[in-house]
Each structure stands twice: as structure tokens, then as C-alpha cells.
């Protein structure tokens, strides 16, 4: 049998060369580079939280504008002139034996010294607040690092700043859990799981107490002006308490700066969460029909105080939030509603008796 004819093959066109992918050059890593290797951190924060953190970082970063430099230069020149004039007056009073003028110069020197000392103290406290943000960034790097040698010293510094004694049970458990073969990420992670929750629990209790006081005060107070003054005072006290728990001593300007940062963070990231949390609870339990208007306002004020405390924790904390250890507004919401219900029931049952 004859095979079928094959089709014609035309060799007129040139052959196409197969494209081969060029190999990349070989990369070698030394022993030192392998120890300091850190994987790239993926930012999984929501868009609103990213905007809030950007606003906080921008507020923490000092702004070096031309006008500020001119003002600082003018103040420095004025201070030097005052000191020079004071020295000249003191020398003239000493030469002429004008004891009254000499006493005035001494009093002025004491006042100026006290003013300079207070300015230096405020600057040091404000610098400490900024330094806490750098420590948080360093902790975030250590939590993604495989190097060895920095984690233990960093955690011991944090414990010393927070006033945790070496004989504290949580710190003793941390010392017993770490060993030389662990890297910085594991050591800092153990500190975050064993020691840091002790301070976080104290801060949570303070937030719960202050939020409950704000809720009950607004619910029973008939004067709006008194409510505003009370809430402002209690919120400042809450910020001071949380900062003290985390080892930060606030001055006048650093307190105002922290309060402004907290309000900025709430304005960017807290409004949607607050509306969602309150709306879900009110729609599910129909509290608007059972509670008075003052009680509803009290719950709102308590939730804002709790939100303020959570953000103050986030700014004063030396470690970033890990996993799900960040306090949730819903936990405080349920606690506030339960306390308010109990208080209203007691107030209704007391007149009947």
C-alpha cells in the first residue's frame, strides 16, 4: 500500500531563533548578612488607620520652617542681650556699692534661672514623648528581625522605664523563658506576651473606671457646662495616668501635644468605628426606647472617653500591637451599658422602698 503524500515544506523563510531568558548573576551572602536578614513587612492596616498614623507621624515630626528659625534666632539674641545687660548692671552695682540694685539683679537672675530650668524640663519631657515613637519603630524592626544581641537589652530598658522591678513575677517568667539560642524577634515577642500585658491590664482598668465615671456623670448631671468641664478634666487625668503607667512623665506642652495627637487620631480613625459600634448595639437592644436622652448622652461620652484612652495607650505604648491584643471599643461598650442599666434600676427601686 502506498502512503499518502506529505504536504510541501517551504524553507524560504529564515529560521527563528528561540529566545532564551538570561540568567541573573549569582548572589552570595556572608555570615554577617545572614544574621541581619529581615523579611519585608507587609502593611495590612486599613486605609483610615494609615491616614491616622500619617497624621500622627507628621505631628510628631518637628517642622523646620524659615519663620520658626527666625523666631528662634531672635529669641536667642534677645536672651543673650538680657544676660549681657544683667552682667553689666551687676558689675556697675558692685562698683558703686548699690546694694538695692545688686539685690534686684540677684532676684532677676533667680527668676531667669527658674524659667530656663522649666523650659529645659519641658523640652526633656517632650523629647521623651517623641523618643517613645522611635522606640516603637525599633520594636517593630526587632519583631521582624532574625539578628541576635539587641532584643534582651531593649526589653530590659523598657522594663526599667516602666518601673517594673527585677523581682516581678512576669519579668521572672520572661527571664526563665529566654535563652541564648533565641533571636531578637523571639525575645521581644516573649516580652510582649509575658510582661507587657501587665501594664496593658492596668491601663484597661483605668480606662474602664474613667469611662464609667464619665457615663454616670453625664447621665445624672443637668448642666451642660458642668458636663463639659468634668469630661475635659477627667480626660486629661486619664491621659496622665496612662502615660505614667508606661513610664512617660508629661509636662505642660507634652501633655497638650499628646492630647492633640489623640484627638487627631480619633478624628481620622475613630468616627466610623464609634458609629458602627454604637449603632449595632442600639439597634440590637433598642436602648433608645428604654433609656432617657441623658443616659444615651452618658453612654456616648463614656465611649468617647474609652476611645481616647485606647489611643493614648497606642501612643504611649513602647511596643506595637501584636495579633489581637489591641483593646476593642465593644468590650468597654458592653461594660458601660451594663453599669448604666444597674445604676438606673437601683435608682428606680430605691424610691419604691
Swiss-Prot record:
| UniProt-annotated stretches for the region Disordered | 16-35
State where composition is biased (Polar residues): 20-31
Query: What subcellular locations does the record give?
Result: Cell inner membrane
Family label: Belongs to the UPF0283 family.
Sorted alphabetically, which InterPro entries does this protein's record hold? DUF697, UPF0283
Q: Looking at the Swiss-Prot or TrEMBL record, what is one Pfam family this protein matches?
A: DUF697
Where does the protein principally reside?
membrane
Organism's domain of life?
Answer: Bacteria
NCBIfam families listed in its UniProt record:
hyp_HI0043
So where does this one cross the membrane? 70-90, 100-120, 213-233
Q: Under what name is this protein listed?
A: UPF0283 membrane protein YcjF
Arranged from A to Z, the UniProt key words for this protein are: Cell inner membrane, Cell membrane, Membrane, Transmembrane, Transmembrane helix
The way this protein sits in the membrane is described as: Multi-pass membrane protein
- Does Membrane appear among the keywords? yes
Provide the Gene Ontology terms for cellular component.
Answer: plasma membrane
Is-annotated flag, keyword Amino-acid biosynthesis?
no
Amino acid at each position: 500500500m502506498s502512503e499518502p503524500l506529505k504536504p510541501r515544506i517551504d524553507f524560504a523563510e529564515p529560521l527563528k531563533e528561540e529566545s532564551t531568558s538570561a540568567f541573573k548573576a549569582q548572589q552570595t551572602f556572608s555570615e554577617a548578612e545572614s544574621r541581619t536578614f529581615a523579611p519585608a513587612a507587609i502593611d495590612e492596616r486599613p486605609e483610615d488607620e494609615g491616614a491616622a498614623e500619617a497624621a500622627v507621624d507628621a505631628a510628631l515630626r518637628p517642622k523646620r520652617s524659615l519663620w520658626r528659625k527666625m523666631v528662634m534666632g531672635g529669641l536667642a539674641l534677645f536672651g543673650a542681650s538680657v544676660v549681657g545687660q544683667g552682667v553689666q548692671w551687676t558689675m556697675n552695682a558692685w562698683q558703686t556699692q548699690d546694694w538695692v540694685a545688686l539685690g534686684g539683679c540677684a532676684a532677676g537672675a533667680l527668676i531667669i534661672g527658674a524659667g530656663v530650668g522649666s523650659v529645659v524640663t519641658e523640652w526633656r519631657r517632650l523629647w521623651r514623648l517623641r523618643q517613645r515613637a522611635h522606640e516603637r519603630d525599633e520594636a517593630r524592626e526587632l519583631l521582624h528581625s532574625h539578628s541576635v544581641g539587641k532584643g534582651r537589652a531593649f526589653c530590659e530598658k523598657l522594663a526599667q522605664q516602666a518601673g517594673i522591678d527585677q523581682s516581678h513575677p512576669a519579668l521572672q517568667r520572661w527571664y526563665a523563658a529566654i535563652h541564648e539560642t533565641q533571636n531578637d524577634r523571639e525575645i521581644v515577642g516573649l516580652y510582649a506576651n509575658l510582661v507587657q500585658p501587665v501594664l496593658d491590664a492596668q491601663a484597661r482598668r483605668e480606662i474602664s473606671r474613667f469611662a464609667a465615671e464619665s457615663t454616670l456623670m453625664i447621665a445624672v448631671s443637668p448642666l451642660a457646662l458642668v458636663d463639659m468641664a468634668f469630661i475635659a478634666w477627667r480626660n486629661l487625668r486619664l491621659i496622665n495616668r496612662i502615660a505614667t503607667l508606661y513610664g512617660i512623665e508629661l509636662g505642660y506642652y507634652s501633655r497638650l501635644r499628646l492630647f492633640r495627637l489623640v484627638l487627631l487620631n480619633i478624628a481620622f480613625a475613630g468616627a466610623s468605628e464609634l458609629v458602627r459600634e454604637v449603632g449595632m448595639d442600639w439597634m440590637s437592644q433598642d436602648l433608645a426606647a428604654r433609656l432617657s436622652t441623658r443616659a444615651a448622652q452618658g453612654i456616648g461620652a463614656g465611649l468617647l472617653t474609652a476611645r481616647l484612652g485606647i489611643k493614648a495607650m497606642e501612643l504611649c505604648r513602647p511596643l506595637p500591637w501584636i495579633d489581637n491584643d489591641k483593646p476593642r471599643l465593644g468590650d468597654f461598650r458592653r461594660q458601660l451599658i451594663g453599669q448604666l442599666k444597674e445604676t438606673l434600676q437601683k435608682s428606680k427601686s430605691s424610691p419604691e422602698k
